[in-house]
Curated annotation (Swiss-Prot):
Belongs to the universal ribosomal protein uL30 family. It comes from Alkaliphilus oremlandii (strain OhILAs). This is Large ribosomal subunit protein uL30. GO terms for molecular function: structural constituent of ribosome. It comes from the Bacteria. InterPro entries: Ribo_uL30_ferredoxin-like_sf, Ribosomal_uL30_bac-type, Ribosomal_uL30_CS, Ribosomal_uL30_ferredoxin-like. The gene is rpmD. CDD domains: Ribosomal_L30 (cd01658). Pfam families: Ribosomal_L30. One of its GO terms (biological process) is translation. Part of the 50S ribosomal subunit. Keywords: Ribonucleoprotein, Ribosomal protein. SUPFAM superfamilies: Ribosomal protein L30p/L7e.
Amino acid sequence: MAKVSIKLTKSVIGTKPNQRKTVEALGLKKIGQVTEKEMTPQLRGMIDVVQHLVEVKEI
């Protein structure tokens, strides 16, 4: 599996509760915070839910 870098680029203020929980489940709390994860189908789905809040790059 490929590794991806996920960066929170926008605030979760004003977003739906499920989007906030998804961002938290990705391991992101603050704007600009970056986490690295293995790309899985589950992770792809989580990224799709919050694609307007995060930036994803393959490593």
